[in-house]
Amino acid sequence: MKGLLPLAWFLACSVPAVQGGLLDLKSMIEKVTGKNALTNYGFYGCYCGWGGRGTPKDGTDWCCWAHDHCYGRLEEKGCNIRTQSYKYRFAWGVVTCEPGPFCHVNLCACDRKLVYCLKRNLRSYNPQYQYFPNILCS
């Protein structure tokens, strides 16, 4: 057990940090879920992708609903969710947000919660909602 701490420290320090932001959410989704972010989640249900309205269609869509609300809370606090950058590490299936200013850390935390939620809901992912027309959301 004693030897694991130095090993863990070495590995944590040797994994390169990845630049974040809205564009890198794609990378985080793909690393954690193994799915193409744009084609699988860019237009999924009523909340995945831009905007959102109505009742989420399933667990995956609820993940996006929660993510939208997480982003909304950050915008209320003055964070620019579309261009704000942050750093995170990804190793052995684990996303770790790097320390930094409030907006950076919390934006990363919103994205981290989303990708783990999407991963938990992979089994219930429904291709029927992959390109769901928002007009049907109420």
From Swiss-Prot:
Q: In which tissues is it expressed?
A: Heart, placenta and less abundantly, in lung. Detected in the outer and inner plexiform layers of the retina (at protein level). Expressed in monocytes and macrophages.
Question: What cofactor is needed?
Answer: Ca(2+)
Name of the protein in question? Phospholipase A2 group V
CDD domains tied to this protein: PLA2c
Tell me which disease this protein is linked to: Fleck retina, familial benign: An autosomal recessive condition associated with a distinctive retinal appearance and no apparent visual or electrophysiologic deficits. Affected individuals are asymptomatic, but fundus examination reveals a striking pattern of diffuse, yellow-white, fleck-like lesions extending to the far periphery of the retina but sparing the foveal region.
Per the record, the gene is PLA2G5
Q: Which reaction does it catalyse?
A: a 1,2-diacyl-sn-glycero-3-phosphocholine + H2O = a 1-acyl-sn-glycero-3-phosphocholine + a fatty acid + H(+); 1-hexadecanoyl-2-(9Z-octadecenoyl)-sn-glycero-3-phosphocholine + H2O = 1-hexadecanoyl-sn-glycero-3-phosphocholine + (9Z)-octadecenoate + H(+); 1-hexadecanoyl-2-(5Z,8Z,11Z,14Z-eicosatetraenoyl)-sn-glycero-3-phosphocholine + H2O = 1-hexadecanoyl-sn-glycero-3-phosphocholine + (5Z,8Z,11Z,14Z)-eicosatetraenoate + H(+); 1-hexadecanoyl-2-(9Z,12Z-octadecadienoyl)-sn-glycero-3-phosphoethanolamine + H2O = 1-hexadecanoyl-sn-glycero-3-phosphoethanolamine + (9Z,12Z)-octadecadienoate + H(+)
Q: What is the effect of changing R112E?
A: Decreases arachidonate release from cell membranes
Give the main EC class. hydrolase
Functionally, this protein is described as follows: Secretory calcium-dependent phospholipase A2 that primarily targets extracellular phospholipids. Hydrolyzes the ester bond of the fatty acyl group attached at sn-2 position of phospholipids (phospholipase A2 activity), preferentially releasing fatty acyl groups with a low degree of unsaturation such as oleoyl (C18:1) and linoleoyl (C18:2) groups. Hydrolyzes low-density lipoprotein (LDL) phospholipids releasing unsaturated fatty acids that drive macrophage polarization toward an M2 phenotype. May act in an autocrine and paracrine manner.
One Gene Ontology biological process? positive regulation of phagocytosis
Compartment annotation: Secreted; Cell membrane; Cytoplasmic vesicle, Phagosome; Recycling endosome
Q: Which residues form the active site?
A: H67, D111
Which Pfam families has this protein been placed in?
A: Phospholip_A2_1
Pathway field: Lipid metabolism; phospholipid metabolism; Lipid metabolism; leukotriene B4 biosynthesis; Lipid metabolism; leukotriene C4 biosynthesis
Does this entry carry the keyword DNA repair? no
- Its predominant location is secreted
Q: Which residue ranges traverse the bilayer?
A: none
This enzyme's EC code(s): 3.1.1.4
Organism per entry: Homo sapiens (Human)
Residues of the signal peptide? 1-20
- What does the entry list as the binding residues for Ca(2+)? Y47, G49, G51, D68
Q: Which GO terms describe its molecular function?
A: calcium ion binding; calcium-dependent phospholipase A2 activity; calcium-independent phospholipase A2 activity; phospholipid binding
| Gene Ontology CC entries for this record | early phagosome; extracellular region; Golgi apparatus; phagolysosome; plasma membrane; recycling endosome
Instruction: Please provide the record's keywords in A-Z order.
Output: Calcium, Cell membrane, Cytoplasmic vesicle, Disease variant, Disulfide bond, Endosome, Fatty acid metabolism, Golgi apparatus, Hydrolase, Lipid degradation, Lipid metabolism, Membrane, Metal-binding, Phagocytosis, Phospholipid degradation, Phospholipid metabolism, Secreted, Signal
PTM entry text: This enzyme lacks one of the seven disulfide bonds found in similar PLA2 proteins.
Textual note on the cofactor: Binds 1 Ca(2+) ion per subunit.
Superkingdom of origin:
Eukaryota
